[in-house]
A protein has these predicted regions:
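A structural signal for short, well-ordered beta-strand segments
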Residues: 6-8, 57, 85
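Short cationic amphipathic helices and targeting signals
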Residues: 54-60
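An amphipathic, aromatic/His-enriched active-site/gating alpha helix that lines ligand/cofactor pockets
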Residues: 60-93
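Short S/T/G/P-rich N-terminal loop/turn motif that feeds into the first structured element of a domain
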Residues: 1-36, 40-42, 47-53, 65-67, ...
């Protein structure tokens, strides 16, 4: 399953609610959301005050469409001023890609 790293930043209003609800409640809510979509929350960490982002997550999803749906749902809450995400690749996925690149590089010699 594809894995995604997300950096998130709360809005000022959401930070106020965060103090009231506590970190564990926010983590539990996200875990439930991801699991209900067939994914798995692997990491949920907060950053120190003064950082550019409020926290970071790593989660696994069945596919990119599922990730996109969860991302849109979370963003629609209005609690985040910014969310940046990247898909993570394993060494074997990179190696497979490099193998494909070799085939593509040869294709330009074939198609003229």
């Amino acid at each position: 399953m594809p894995r995604y790293l997300s950096l998130f930043k709360y809005t000022p209003e959401a930070r106020k609610g965060f103090v009231k609800e506590k970190a564990a409640a926010r983590e539990a809510a996200l875990k439930l959301t991801i699991e209900s979509a067939g994914g798995k929350l692997e990491l949920f960490n907060w950053t120190v005050p003064g950082s550019d982002y409020s926290g970071v997550t790593i989660a696994e999803f069945p596919d990119a469409s599922t990730y996109t749906a969860v991302f849109a749902l979370v963003k629609a809450t209005g609690a985040f001023s910014e969310i940046k995400a990247v898909e993570l690749l394993t060494a074997s996925e990179i190696d497979r890609g490099l193998g494909t690149w070799g085939l593509v590089a040869q294709a330009d010699k074939i198609v003229t």
